[in-house]
Amino acid sequence: MSKLNAYFGEYGGQFVPQILVPALDQLEQEFIKAQADESFKQEFKELLQEYAGRPTALTKTRNIVKNTKTTLYLKREDLLHGGAHKTNQVLGQALLAKRMGKKEIIAETGAGQHGVATALACALLDLKCRVYMGAKDVERQSPNVFRMKLMGAEVIPVHSGSATLKDACNEALRDWSANYSKAHYLLGTAAGPHPFPTIVREFQRMIGEETKQQILAKEGRLPDAVIACVGGGSNAIGMFADFIDEKNVKLIGVEPAGKGIETGEHGAPLKHGKTGIFFGMKAPLMQNSDGQIEESYSISAGLDFPSVGPQHAHLLAIGRAEYASATDDEALDAFKLLCKKEGIIPALESSHALAHALKLAYEDPNKEQLLVVNLSGRGDKDIFTVHDILKEKGEI
């Protein structure tokens, strides 16, 4: 039986109740077979092209870094059906579930984007769908909750703990433990127990593959850096995967610094966490001195996650990727600027990556550099949040 590597350096693994091991083993074997099956790959490719709208554009910005020598491109995952990069890997996993004969899909969601993507894939592929969502996030993201329901998904609010994403993850795993024979757990990020981090990366890697082809066609060279926001880390690993072996391309992940790292209200476990076991994996975690999981915080529900995918932890440990952070205010400024200067409303998640790119462009305006930001999603879901914050600040 061929096996994928369960670890990235010291990170990853499979820390789950024994009852789930057969389900994870089955998933791993089916994934290995599917990756070698031309008809599976063709069906996935067709869905991505005909249904989701790939390849997505690589857009050169016109105004936002006009007074610098930086050339800035945006990889437009916001243009994907469903509004974010989430759709890519969800279609892949849903096809895998069908291949395994599973009729039901269980998912967790924070911002609601993964829930929406899962709901649309289940509607398309005729699978029963239930989505666990922290009760707080249900309030924060009502448009996405309604979208899921419109597409036939059952949305289950989770009131335990902090009533956010980590609690939804726990409930989803609990459900799967009871129902794994008929249900597939469609995990929403490149984290969790093996083989999920690998599967999600492989079903997102077209982001970086397309970017590489597109930038070579437009600029005749590879970028100096690719930049992506990091919550669980799937959009970032999708962008990074095809560039890992290109040693001259910097890989920069941007975590949410929330109200400031020093306040403790942030979601930056890579740079400011401790290694522990959470959500079925060994990874950096936000923990207090007793080793309890700390609440993460970010203006953006999709980055509000107290851990991170194991491959990111490994890339940091070996020095191949670097990880910065952006505060709520910096992300908000980048959000407003992209709206005003380019006519694109980005997701608050993606705005963190953009904020760091702008920092790089403006800290040395005379530096010639070619940067690509993964614009991982569109900001329609965030306009009410932003409206309320700007109103509070007296800006509108």
Swiss-Prot record:
Coiled coil residues, start to end: none
Keyword Magnesium: no
Species name: Francisella tularensis subsp. novicida (strain U112)
E.C. designation(s): 4.2.1.20
One GO cellular component, as annotated: cytoplasm
InterPro entries: Trp_synth_b_CS, Trp_synth_beta, Trp_synth_beta/beta-like, TrpB-like_PALP, TrpB-like_PALP_sf
Protein name stated in the entry: Tryptophan synthase beta chain
Gene3D superfamilies: 3.40.50.1100
General function of this protein: The beta subunit is responsible for the synthesis of L-tryptophan from indole and L-serine.
Source superkingdom: Bacteria
Catalytic activity: (1S,2R)-1-C-(indol-3-yl)glycerol 3-phosphate + L-serine = D-glyceraldehyde 3-phosphate + L-tryptophan + H2O
Matches recorded under HAMAP family: Trp_synth_beta
Pfam families in alphabetical order: PALP (PF00291)
Pathway annotation: Amino-acid biosynthesis; L-tryptophan biosynthesis; L-tryptophan from chorismate: step 5/5
